[in-house]
Design a protein with these regions (language model features):
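Acidic, surface-exposed loops and disordered segments
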Residues: 1-184
Length: 184
């Protein structure tokens, strides 16, 4: 495939086994830039990111998050957090005009940022995987405590990033024509 963007999308897969090698700071900054390049409703960008390279913090998260055990060997992690209050400023104006509630668009916006983080990690030769925090109240509380995140910020997920143990693992082809419905 010649198109690099499509190749990156179609070959990305969740990686749960890492070599414990460090992730370069410049690479983390590039990955974060990709996350912040995601679309968001009315460009509100209701997100905040916590970049983690400290082994003690990675291990503390690993201990508290049952589906993030791969943090024990990850070289870094990014916690994608939502800023619901930032989205609400826009929501109040739209609610009056459109009579709809857009209060949870921070989830959609942060999810788009998360996908960009996963794709950028893959493009730079790293593996990554989305591990959910939101909407589990205990996980939210634990992540907030470990990272000292204020109450008005909600951790959506923790994305472990690292050098994959198996760099040649092929992705699964997830295309299913039965999931496509045409207009007629």
């Amino acid at each position: 495939m010649e198109n690099e963007a499509l190749k990156n999308i179609l070959t990305r897969h969740s990686v749960r086994e890492f070599t414990a090698e460090a992730v370069k700071k410049d690479d983390l900054l590039t990955i974060l830039r990709a996350g912040m390049s995601a679309p968001s409703a009315v460009n509100r960008q209701p997100w905040s990111f916590v970049a983690i390279t400290n082994r003690e913090i990675l291990d503390a998260l690993c201990e508290k998050l049952p589906f993030a055990k791969m943090l024990s060997k990850a070289g870094a992690a990014i916690v994608v957090c939502g800023l619901p209050d930032k989205a609400k400023i826009f929501n109040l104006a739209v609610k009056v005009v459109a009579r709809i509630s857009l209060g949870d668009f921070w989830i959609t916006d942060c999810s788009a940022a998360s996908e960009n983080i996963l794709l950028a990690s893959h493009a730079l030769g790293y593996g990554a995987v989305w591990t959910a925090v939101f909407p589990d109240e205990k996980k939210i509380k634990d992540v907030r405590e470990i990272l000292k995140i204020p109450e008005d910020i909600i951790p959506l997920n923790v994305i472990p990033i690292g050098v994959p143990v198996n760099k040649n693992e092929p992705p699964k082809d997830k295309f299913k024509e039965k999931n496509i419905h045409w207009e007629n």
